[in-house]
């Protein structure tokens, strides 16, 4: 019986050893087959592909980093997240991708174990930080579009710095476990780089995907979903407003022209407005789909590959699919400067100005040095493809072409910096009655939002100082009166009523004011009674002693 059990155990061990050896030999054969498949043409095509990816990642992110760094007014709070995103992608192209290029040529890792672990950590860290930064940018745009008036209070400089620090700490927590025993780091001959051994610890693979990929992806879906819903609602409101305006204009013009021509022109304008707003709505939808679609296309295949490896083993994925899924994740670093950098009108025009010299600057940037907190808000809104009309309504103002009829505040827009810069200005319904004109409104103010805030702060500071001065003056007066009262009481206690000046017992009456005279006499009597009671109390106290 023992002999049979020993034989079965030996056979099972032998089968396991054979399966492991066959697995290793199978992967080796696949590697050799992949290397020899297509001859030198396949190796050359892979080399050219990874070289192109590396160059595009490096140049694209470097251009955005330099543009934002040189033009300080562009480095708003929102663009600080973009700056961090592109800078991390640039570091990926410098510290990781060159070694991937070398490994794709040599078909092995030649840089040692230490650098293998370090490059794997860098790849995971930068990739995780990039995905989390996309989620933070979505939150920033959410507040800019849905709550533009409280955006400067919600998204502050300190909170932006704290968000960036949190992004990197969050990413570091998700990337350190392979260096401390939960999973491990290995050179993957089909990814041509050192990565975490996703097939060894399925638990870590699922943890990293949820912690660093699924979490920001859900944030993006929720935030951009709310943004698009608000854009649709505001577009309907603007469209209804234009219909009312057209009808009123038609009624006015009907008094001068025939009703037939008026109705036809009104219907044409109404149709034109509907086309414009539907186009803006489609542009916003396209922008959101591009942002989310780029994330899914670049990172989706890689997530599917590592999930398959974690659940069904290393050999379940085709080597070619594994290679291209990994390299497709590198292309996300190409999409980021395009979507979050060049998609921005202001950044794009500044970049063209840097490339084509001062002539382009003079034509496009007359007031490019003006800075504003609401410049950042408008950037976030217009980057989503929303029209100035929608931007005005989302900020709580009126559509362009309408003046405020309720009016504490109104909004006008300027294209000075290549985007819709929002300017806050005052208006009243009495001085500015509502007018419906088809011509574009004139710019009524060039005062920036920060200037308005500074003026309000100065006025509040002056009023606060005035109130403090009045309070101190009242306190000083009260203290002086209290001191005189204490002094009078002390004199009464020591010297009696005769020591006090006679003016205290003289009632001030105003001639012709009978009520004031009677009130003064009653006050005098009350004072005498109080002094008499005090004096009698002092005498009784002396007799008792």
Curated annotation (Swiss-Prot):
Q: What is its main location?
A: membrane
| Record-annotated membrane-spanning stretches | 47-67, 81-101, 118-139, 160-180, 206-226, 286-306, 323-343
Gene3D superfamilies (alphabetical): Rhodopsin 7-helix transmembrane proteins
Q: What is the effect of changing residue 251 to A?
A: In mut3; does not affect localization to primary cilia
Q: Which residues are glycosylated?
A: 21, 32, 117
One GO location term (cellular component)? cilium
Keyword Zinc among record annotations: no
User: What follows loss of this gene?
Assistant: Embryonic lethality by 10.5 dpc caused by increased Shh signaling and ventralization throughout the developing neural tube. Defects in Gli3 processing.
Its Gene Ontology molecular function terms?
G protein-coupled receptor activity
State the annotated membrane topology for this chain: Multi-pass membrane protein
What are the protein's UniProt keywords? Cataract, Cell membrane, Cell projection, Cilium, Developmental protein, Disulfide bond, G-protein coupled receptor, Glycoprotein, Membrane, Receptor, Transducer, Transmembrane, Transmembrane helix
Cystine pairings recorded for this chain: 116-194
Which locations, inside or outside the cell, does it occupy? Cell projection, Cilium membrane; Cell membrane
- PROSITE patterns attached to this UniProt entry: G_PROTEIN_RECEP_F1_1 (PS00237), G_PROTEIN_RECEP_F1_2 (PS50262)
Q: Which residues lie on this side of the membrane: Cytoplasmic?
A: 68-80, 140-159, 227-285, 344-545
Its domain of life reads: Eukaryota
Example of a GO biological process term: negative regulation of smoothened signaling pathway involved in dorsal/ventral neural tube patterning
- Which of the residues are on side Extracellular? 1-46, 102-117, 181-205, 307-322
Q: Which disease is it linked to?
A: An intragenic deletion in Gpr161 is responsible for the vacuolated lens (vl) phenotype that is characterized by neural tube defects and congenital cataracts. The vl mutation aroses spontaneously. About half of vl/vl embryos display lumbar-sacral spina bifida and die before birth, and the other half have closed neural tubes but show thinning of the midline neuroepithelium and epidermis, dilation of the dorsal ventricle, and presence of ectopic neuroepithelial cells in the ventricle. All surviving adults display congenital cataracts. It is not a null mutant allele.
Summarize the protein's role: Key negative regulator of Shh signaling, which promotes the processing of GLI3 into GLI3R during neural tube development. Recruited by TULP3 and the IFT-A complex to primary cilia and acts as a regulator of the PKA-dependent basal repression machinery in Shh signaling by increasing cAMP levels, leading to promote the PKA-dependent processing of GLI3 into GLI3R and repress the Shh signaling. In presence of SHH, it is removed from primary cilia and is internalized into recycling endosomes, preventing its activity and allowing activation of the Shh signaling. Its ligand is unknown.
Q: What is this protein called?
A: G-protein coupled receptor 161
What is the organism of origin for this protein? Answer: Mus musculus (Mouse)
Gene encoding it?
Gpr161
């Amino acid at each position: 019986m023992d002999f049979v059990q020993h034989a079965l155990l030996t056979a099972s061990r032998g089968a396991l050893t054979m399966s492991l050896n066959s697995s290793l030999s199978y992967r080796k054969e696949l590697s050799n087959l992949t290397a020899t498949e297509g001859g030198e043409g396949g190796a050359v095509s892979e080399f050219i592909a990874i070289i192109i990816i590396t160059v595009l990642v490096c140049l694209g992110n470097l251009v955005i980093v330099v543009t934002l760094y040189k033009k300080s007014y562009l480095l708003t709070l929102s663009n600080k997240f973009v700056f961090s995103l592109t800078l991390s992608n640039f570091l990926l192209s410098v510290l990781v991708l060159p070694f991937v290029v070398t490994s794709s040529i040599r078909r092995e890792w030649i840089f040692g174990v230490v650098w293998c672990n370090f490059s794997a950590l860098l790849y995971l860290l930068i990739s995780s930080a990039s995905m989390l930064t996309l989620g933070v940018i979505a939150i920033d745009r959410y507040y800019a579009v849905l709550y533009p008036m409280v955006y400067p209070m919600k998204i502050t400089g300190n909170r932006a710095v704290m968000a960036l620090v949190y992004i990197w700490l969050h990413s570091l927590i998700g990337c350190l476990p392979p260096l401390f025993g939960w999973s491990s780091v290995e050179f993957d001959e089909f990814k041509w780089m050192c990565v975490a051994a996703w097939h060894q610890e399925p638990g870590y693979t699922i943890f990293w995907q949820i912690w660093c990929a699924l979490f920001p992806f859900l944030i993006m879906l929720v935030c951009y979903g709310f943004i698009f819903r608000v854009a649709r609602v505001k577009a309907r409101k603007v469209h209804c407003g234009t219909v009312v305006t057209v009808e009123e204009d038609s009624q006015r013009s009907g008094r001068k022209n025939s009703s037939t021509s008026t109705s036809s022109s009104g219907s044409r304008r109404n149709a034109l407005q509907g086309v414009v707003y539907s186009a803006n709505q489609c542009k916003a939808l396209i922008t959101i789909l591009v942002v989310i679609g780029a994330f899914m296309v670049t990172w989706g295949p890689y997530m599917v590959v590592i999930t398959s490896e974690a659940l069904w083993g290393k050999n379940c994925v085709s080597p070619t699919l594994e290679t291209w899924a990994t390299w497709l994740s590198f292309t996300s670093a190409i999409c980021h400067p395009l979507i979050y950098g060049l998609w921005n009108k202001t950044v794009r025009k500044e970049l063209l100005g840097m490339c084509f010299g001062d002539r382009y600057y003079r034509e496009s940037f007359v007031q490019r040095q003006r800075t504003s907190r609401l410049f950042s808000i408008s950037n976030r809104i217009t980057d989503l493809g929303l029209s100035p009309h929608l931007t005005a309504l989302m900020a709580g103002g009126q559509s362009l072409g309408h003046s405020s009829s309720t009016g504490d505040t109104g909004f006008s827009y300027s294209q000075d910096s290549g985007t819709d810069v929002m300017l806050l200005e005052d208006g009243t319904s009495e001085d500015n009655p509502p007018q419906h004109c088809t011509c574009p409104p004139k710019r009524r103010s060039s005062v920036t939002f920060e200037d308005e805030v500074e003026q309000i702060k100065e006025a509040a500071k002056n009023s606060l100082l005035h109130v403090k001065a009045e309070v101190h003056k009242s306190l000083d007066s009260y203290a002086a009166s209290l001191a005189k009262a204490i002094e009078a009481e002390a004199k009464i206690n020591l010297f009696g009523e005769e020591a006090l000046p006679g003016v205290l017992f003289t009632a001030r009456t105003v001639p012709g004011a009978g009520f004031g005279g009677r009130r003064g006499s009653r006050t005098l009597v009350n004072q005498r009674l109080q002094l008499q009671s005090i004096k009698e109390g002092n005498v009784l106290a002396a007799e008792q002693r």
